[in-house]
Amino acid sequence: TRPAIAPDSMTTLLDILAPSAVIVGLEGDTKDAIIEELVDRLEVGTAISDRDKVLQAVLEREKIMSTGIGDGIAIPHGKSDAVIELTAALGIHKRGVDFEALDGEPAFVFFLLVSPANVSGPHIKALARISRMLKNDGFKKKLIEAESSADIISAIEEEEKSHSSVG
């Protein structure tokens, strides 16, 4: 578990991403299976209060428009009153999964972000930060080639340091 953070105090992605929510080798082969696998890694009782409600919120958001943003990346996200605090899960799929991305290509990197229903600012800031970091091809390559969750956490720490002066 990790300490609770105030909604506006996220300073790095690791503030919202518990090591237990990092998956190297996602197993699902459909969009829904990937989302479910990621939601299952969120900490019930700490980050979320109801796994099924959170899963439903993310799947409903996905129906509106795919969060497969292209270039091998998907950022499924949602808001729910079953989310206690802004939280995330990150998964890598070595073979790639069709996520109905804008470019039609499979996604390999999946960053799930969920936040309380009544909070927008931190959710949008976190989405922007994730998106900015994943535009760095070197960083994305490190994630895809990671052998362990520790490799992913190290890559995030390194990337965060290189952007520490940018908010």
Regions found by a protein language model. Name each.
Residues 1-167:
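Cytosolic covalent-transfer regions centered on His/Cys nucleophiles
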